[in-house]
C-alpha cells in the first residue's frame, strides 16, 4: 500500500483559519477518495502559518474495477408495441457505450425502466490524484480568501509552492501558476531555503532541520512546557489559558518562550483589564503568585530562537507599557463620572434600530428582572432592580470603549469603588454570564435574574422584528442566550413558566414589534424548545427526551426531571415490553374518555383485574408525580404491565356495545393520563 503527501506552502495564514482548514482538508479529501473508489487507511493533517499539509496511508496503486448501472427511459418509451428498441433506447445505449441488445429492464416504484450495465476498468491512482488534488486545494473554504497577481484562483493567502508525492513520485498538477513538485521551504527567518522531500517521514525530518515543527499538537506541547518553565523561573505560576495556547501555536513554526515585566504600579488597574490587555491585544500569558495574585510579568512566544532575547523582551515590554498606560488612564478618568450618571448616556446609544436605545432595553429587562424576583425570591427585588439599572452603564465608559471584553467587569469595579452594595456590584458582572457554552453561570439570584431578563428581552426583541437566526447566521447570539437562560434555570432549579415570561417580555416590547405577538411567541417558545431538546439529547437518549418534552416543557426543571427519570427507568428489566404495552394504551385511547369506570359493565375478569391494579396505584402515583418523584411513579406504573397484557389478550376494547366500549376506553384513559403526565410513550423506541 502506498502513501500520499501534499503540502501547500503559503504566505502567513491567519491563525484562526488554520484549524478549520486542516479539518476541511481531511473531510474534502476523504469524500474525493470515496467518490473515486479509492480505499485508504487514514488521513493526517498538519498546519502552520506558512503551510497546510496532509498525508494519506494505505492507498492502492490502481482504482478497483467497477460495474456501473445507468438508468434510462421507461420501458414503454424504450420499446415499441412489438418489443423493438425505439430511437430513445438506441440513443441511450449509444450514449452509454453499450450495444442496445445488452440493455436490461429494472423494476422501480414508478414502473419498469431500461438500464445499461457497463464495466469500468480501474485507473491508476496517481492519475486520479492529479485530478483530485487541484480540486482539493481550490475547495478548501476560508472565511476570507484572496486572489493574487492576475491569477483566477483564490486561497487564504498567496501560494508559493506545492509538494505532491505518491509513493515518492510527483503527482503533477498546476494551481494558478504553481506547479507541484518535491521542493518545500524552511523557516522564513531561520532557514529560508528550499529542500527536497522524498516522503512524509523525510518531510518531518527535514522540517526539523529547517526549524519548522509542522505538527500543531507538538508545537502546543513545546509551548506548554516552555511557558510553565519560564513562569517557574520568574518565581510564579502560569495563569492557564488553553484558548490562547492553541492560538499562539498557530502563530509560529518554531516556538520559544521569553519572560518580560511591567511596572508594579499597573497592578492598581483591575486584574481582568491587565489580563485582557496582555491576552487579547498582545497574545501574552499572565503569571500569578502562590496566592493566585497577578504578578507584574508576562510570557510571550517568539517564532524564532534568539541567543540574546533582551531586544525582543524590551520591544514587547515597550508595547505593553503603552497599552497598560492607556488602561490606567481610562481607569482613572472613568472614576470621575458615577455609574448612575452614565446611565443617562445610554439614551444616546442605539441598541438596535428597531428596538430602540440601550436605555430603553434596560428599562424593559429591569421590569422583567423585578418580576422574576417577585416570583422566585422577593427578598432581593430591590437589589435586582438596582443591578439591572446599573449593569449597562459601563458601556459608555472609556475603559470598555478601549477594551470591550471587560464590559460588566468594569461596571462591577466602578460600583465597588463608588460604595455600591457588594451583591449588586457582583450581579453587574454576572449578568453577562454564561459567555459561552458550558461557561460559568451567575452565582447569585440577583445576577441570575438580571442575566435571564436581559437575554429574554434580546431574544423576544430580535424575533419580534424579524431578526431570527438561520442555519449559518446568528449575529445577536440568540442561541447562546437561550442556552444561557436554560442552563441558569436548570442550575438554580427555578420553577417558572417560560411561556408566562415570554408573554411579559412581549408585552414590554409591544410598541416595537413588527410581527404579530402571537406568531413571535410561538416562534420563541419553539426556539427554546429546540435548544432544550438539543441540550438534553447530549445527556440522555434522544427518544427519552422527545417523549418527556412531548408531555410538556413549559417548566424546564420539571421536564428535565422527567427526562432523567425516564432515562433511568430504561434499566428496568421489563422496559421494552412495558413501553410497547404503554404505547398500545396511548394509541387506543388517543384523546381519552372523560367518564367514570363502571364496574357493573365489566364482562371479563381481565377488566376487573386491570381496574383493581389501576386503583391500587393511582393515588400513590398522583402523589409522586405531584412531588416530582417521577422514577418512583414509573416504577409503580410498571406493576400494571401484567394486567394490561392480560387485558389486551382477552378483551376486545372496541366492543359493539357503545356503553361497554366507552367503559373500557375510560379504564385505559386512567392509565394513559398517569403516563401522559410524565411522557408520551409513543415517542419511545421499543
UniProtKB/Swiss-Prot annotation:
Source organism's superkingdom? Bacteria
GO CC annotation terms, alphabetical: cytosol
The reply to whether Heme figures as a keyword in the UniProt entry is no
Q: Tell me, what's a Pfam family for it?
A: tRNA_synt_2f
Which reactions are catalysed by this chain? Answer: tRNA(Gly) + glycine + ATP = glycyl-tRNA(Gly) + AMP + diphosphate
Where does the UniProt annotation locate this protein? Cytoplasm
Going by the record, the broad EC class of this enzyme is ligase
Q: Which family does it belong to?
A: Belongs to the class-II aminoacyl-tRNA synthetase family.
HAMAP family linked to this entry: Gly_tRNA_synth_beta (MF_00255)
Protein name from the UniProt record: Glycine--tRNA ligase beta subunit
Q: Which organism is it from?
A: Geobacter metallireducens (strain ATCC 53774 / DSM 7210 / GS-15)
Amino acid at each position: 500500500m502506498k502513501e500520499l503527501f501534499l503540502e501547500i506552502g503559503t504566505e502567513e495564514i491567519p491563525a484562526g483559519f488554520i484549524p478549520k482548514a486542516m479539518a476541511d482538508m481531511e473531510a474534502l479529501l476523504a469524500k474525493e477518495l470515496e467518490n473515486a473508489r479509492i480505499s485508504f487507511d487514514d488521513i493526517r493533517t498538519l498546519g502552520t502559518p506558512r503551510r497546510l499539509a496532509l498525508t494519506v496511508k494505505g492507498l492502492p496503486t490502481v482504482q478497483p474495477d467497477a460495474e456501473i448501472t445507468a438508468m434510462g427511459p421507461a420501458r414503454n418509451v424504450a420499446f415499441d408495441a412489438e418489443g423493438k428498441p425505439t430511437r430513445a433506447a438506441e440513443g441511450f445505449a449509444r450514449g452509454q457505450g453499450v450495444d442496445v441488445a445488452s440493455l436490461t429492464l429494472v423494476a422501480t416504484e414508478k414502473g419498469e425502466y431500461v438500464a445499461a450495465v457497463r464495466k469500468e476498468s480501474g485507473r491508476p491512482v496517481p492519475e486520479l490524484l492529479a485530478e483530485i488534488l487541484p480540486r482539493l486545494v481550490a475547495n478548501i473554504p476560508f472565511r476570507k480568501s484572496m486572489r493574487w497577481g492576475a491569477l483566477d484562483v483564490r486561497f487564504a493567502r498567496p501560494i508559493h509552492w506545492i509538494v505532491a508525492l505518491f509513493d515518492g513520485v510527483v503527482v503533477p498538477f498546476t494551481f494558478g501558476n504553481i506547479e507541484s513538485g518535491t521542493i518545500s521551504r524552511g523557516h522564513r527567518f531561520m532557514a529560508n531555503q528550499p529542500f527536497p522531500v522524498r516522503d512524509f517521514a523525510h518531510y518531518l525530518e527535514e522540517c526539523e532541520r529547517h526549524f519548522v515543527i509542522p505538527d500543531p499538537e507538538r508545537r502546543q506541547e513545546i509551548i506548554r512546557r516552555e511557558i510553565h518553565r519560564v513562569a517557574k523561573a520568574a518565581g510564579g505560576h502560569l495563569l492557564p489559558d488553553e484558548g490562547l495556547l492553541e492560538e499562539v501555536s498557530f502563530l509560529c513554526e518554531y516556538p520559544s518562550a521569553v519572560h518580560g515585566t511591567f511596572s508594579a504600579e499597573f497592578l492598581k488597574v483591575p486584574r481582568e483589564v491587565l489580563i485582557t490587555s496582555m491576552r487579547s491585544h498582545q497574545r501574552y500569558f499572565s503569571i500569578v503568585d502562590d496566592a493566585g495574585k497577578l504578578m507584574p510579568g508576562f510570557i510571550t512566544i517568539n517564532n524564532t530562537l534568539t541567543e540574546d532575547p533582551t531586544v525582543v523582551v524590551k520591544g514587547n515590554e515597550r508595547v505593553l507599557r503603552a497599552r497598560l498606560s492607556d488602561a490606567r488612564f481610562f481607569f482613572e478618568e472613568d472614576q470621575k463620572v458615577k455609574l448612575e450618571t452614565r446611565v443617562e448616556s445610554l439614551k444616546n446609544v442605539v441598541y438596535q434600530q428597531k428596538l430602540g436605545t440601550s436605555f430603553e432595553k434596560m428599562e424593559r429587562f429591569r421590569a422583567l428582572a423585578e418580576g422574576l424576583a417577585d416570583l422566585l425570591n422577593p427578598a432581593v427585588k430591590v437589589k435586582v432592580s438596582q443591578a439591572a439599572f446599573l449593569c449597562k452603564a459601563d458601556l459608555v465608559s472609556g475603559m470598555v470603549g478601549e477594551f470591550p471584553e471587560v464590559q460588566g467587569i468594569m461596571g462591577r469595579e466602578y460600583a465597588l469603588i463608588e460604595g455600591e452594595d457588594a451583591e449588586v456590584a457582583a450581579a453587574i458582572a454576572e449578568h453577562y454570564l454564561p459567555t459561552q457554552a458550558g461557561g460559568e453561570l451567575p452565582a447569585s439570584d440577583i445576577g441570575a435574574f438580571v442575566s435571564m431578563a436581559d437575554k429574554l428581552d434580546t431574544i423576544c426583541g430580535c424575533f419580534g422584528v424579524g431578526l431570527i437566526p438561520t442555519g449559518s447566521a446568528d449575529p445577536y447570539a440568540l442561541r447562546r442566550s437561550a442556552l444561557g437562560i436554560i442552563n441558569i434555570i436548570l442550575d438554580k432549579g427555578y420553577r417558572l413558566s417560560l411561556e408566562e415570561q415570554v408573554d411579559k417580555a412581549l408585552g414590554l416590547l409591544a410598541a416595537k414589534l413588527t410581527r404579530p405577538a402571537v406568531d413571535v411567541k410561538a416562534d420563541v417558545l419553539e426556539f427554546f424548545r429546540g435548544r432544550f431538546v438539543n441540550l438534553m439529547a447530549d445527556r440522555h437518549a434522544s427518544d427519552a427526551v422527545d417523549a418527556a418534552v412531548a408531555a410538556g416543557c413549559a417548566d424546564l426543571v420539571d421536564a428535565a426531571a422527567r427526562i432523567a427519570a425516564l432515562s433511568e427507568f430504561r434499566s428496568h428489566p421489563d422496559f421494552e415490553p412495558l413501553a410497547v404495552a404503554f404505547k398500545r394504551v396511548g394509541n387506543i385511547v388517543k384523546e381519552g374518555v372523560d367518564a367514570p369506570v363502571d364496574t357493573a359493565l365489566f364482562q371479563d375478569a381481565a377488566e376487573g383485574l386491570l381496574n383493581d391494579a389501576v386503583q391500587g396505584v393511582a393515588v400513590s402515583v398522583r402523589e409522586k408525580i405531584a412531588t416530582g418523584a417521577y422514577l418512583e411513579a414509573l416504577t409503580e406504573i410498571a406493576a400494571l404491565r401484567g394486567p394490561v397484557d392480560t387485558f389486551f389478550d382477552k378483551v376486545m376494547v372496541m366492543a359493539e356495545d357503545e356503553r361497554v366500549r366507552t367503559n373500557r376506553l375510560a379504564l385505559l384513559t386512567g392509565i394513559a393520563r398517569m403516563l401522559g403526565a410524565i411522557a408520551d410513550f409513543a415517542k419511545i423506541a421499543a
